[in-house]
Amino acid sequence: MKATTLTIMATRGEDQDLVQQTAVSLSAKKSQSTTDRVVPCFGWHPWFSHQILDDTAQPTAAQSPAEHKSTHYAAVLAPSPADDQPFIDLLPVPKPLSELISETRNRLQQFPNALVGEVGLDRAFRLPSPWTPTDIDNRDDQLTPGSREGRRLSNYRVKPEHQRTVLKAQLQLAGEMNRAVSLHSVQAHGGIFEVLKELWAGHERVVLSRRKRDKQRDAEGAVSGDDEGDDEDKTPIGSQSTKSSDPDGKSYPPFPPRICMHSYTGSVEPIRQFLHPSNPSDKVGDVIKALPEDRILIESDLHVAGAQMDELLEDVARQACQLRGWELRHGVQVLADNWRRFVFG
């Protein structure tokens, strides 16, 4: 394997501990290099968000565990499976959201460079059909449980509002811990933007028009010069203090410091919305061309490490360089610098 560091995402209950164990194991065996072999990422993917119970909502009437489980899934899935008890019976007992956030916080504290991910919104996916006895007998035991593994899809989807609740809690944790986030977004770019907008409300930058900038310079007795340098004209407003669990005791805004739009497949327009100056921070080809140079990351998005992963990383790096008109050595250096800045700040 040529890649020196793996950024490994957790997605569901079955792989949080596996990512943690892998990071511990490889970090213990690393050489004198200052870069860890693994950057672990902890989060709950939207495909599994139905397994999370929002215990921050109004308490429900006293129910048995079985009734509580049925009520939860009937509320968060669409269409409601209230009349499909066999389907509900085969779903796992939901995990309280507060428990997920507490566990993720502990894992982030263990790994100072860990990220939050993979999290997000997905309006397209459907839950797979329950396991049949034949499916169980024929499944590959080498695979981590919890994924689809070829099962047919059901008609059930997770309601967008429930996905938003699970996502928002994890983004708030990322802000609290000052960690970058890997975001999954399928047919939900507007929803992602709205969640982020809610989190950074009161922290927007003020973007002055040219006329107001000139008036401000004149009022300050400054010599009117070049109109460029927008970054110097952006003035943060609103309180920047929030409670933080970061070991250094610092307080951070209630939103992630850095976000990667993982495998972005939307159009250029939503990206322009995300990159608007007021924010505190072919179709794919158009997006790569439209992005600022320091906002491009590449990935293999592969479930195994090795030669195939290296080949995919090389292929996508070459494509990015070709689209941007970069000389290969320069482009690879840009992409490497972007990754280090995204992960380590």
Protein language model features and the residues they cover:
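Divalent metal-dependent hydrolysis catalytic cores, especially in the metallo-beta-lactamase
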Residues: 1-50, 114-115, 180, 258
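Active-site gating loops and adjacent loop-to-helix segments of metal-dependent hydrolytic enzymes
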Residues: 44, 50-90, 125-156, 312-317
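Short acidic/histidine-rich active-site segments
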Residues: 294-309
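Conserved, mostly hydrophobic/aromatic
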Residues: 19, 40, 118, 174, ...
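Divalent metal-binding pocket/active-site signature
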Residues: 1, 86-277, 305
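Mid-to-C-terminal alpha-helical segments outside catalytic/metal-binding sites
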Residues: 312-345
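Active-site glycine- and acidic-residue-rich loops that bind
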Residues: 10-15, 48-53, 84-99, 281-286
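Acidic (Asp/Glu)-rich catalytic clusters
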Residues: 20-37, 103-114, 274-279, 287-292
